[in-house]
Regions:
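Chitinase-like catalytic core of GlcNAc-active glycosidases
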Residues: 1-173
Length: 173
């Protein structure tokens, strides 16, 4: 239950946790529609569908609520979308943030396979991962009338080739 985070309070009355990350929606490929999309399992969808009761109390206490996006063993992956694919998927994620009043998106690319071709896909690279972060942040800024975050956990397939990644001026190794 994400509401458990409210129970951890510092001596000054502030919440102990800065953010709760809902784990996880999936980046998936729909072969019949030829489209990358976010798929929520029943547990995540239940949290989203009950946002007013389960997520908004966190936000009212100053705790950010993010939806993590995880690869799901198919060709759609955080670091493998084309520039156009990054823009399209970033817009979808921003719309989800608006619809469910979320504070942002987290990316975790542990389970993508990276074998896609076509207009949605590019070879996996740190540049394409950064592009997806950028396009998502840009779309959230355009749609959401509140501050939004992009969180990066792991870049899976390309992680070992990266000396470090800079996100909002902070180095991550």
């Amino acid at each position: 239950n994400p509401l458990n985070a409210i129970e951890y309070i510092l001596e000054d009355g502030q919440p102990f946790f800065d953010a709760v990350v809902l784990f996880a929606g999936n980046i998936n490929w729909d072969a019949s529609k030829q489209k990358v999309y976010m798929n929520a399992n029943p547990n995540v969808q239940a949290l989203l569908d009950n946002s007013e009761e389960l997520l908004q109390p966190l936000r009212k206490k100053g705790i950010k609520v993010l939806l993590d996006i995880l690869g799901n063993h198919d060709q759609a992956g955080i670091a493998g979308l084309s520039d156009w694919g990054c823009e399209q998927f970033g817009k979808e994620l921003a719309q989800i943030c608006l619809d469910y009043k979320l504070d942002g998106i987290g990316f975790d690319d542990e389970y993508s396979s990276y074998y896609g071709s076509g207009k949605w896909f590019a070879g996996p690279s740190s540049q394409q991962a950064a592009r997806l972060c950028y396009e998502t942040k840009k779309a959230m800024k355009e749609l959401c009338p509140w501050e939004t975050w992009v969180h990066l956990y792991y870049l899976g397939y390309i992680q070992s080739s990266l000396p470090s990644v800079f996100i909002d001026g902070v180095e991550h190794k």
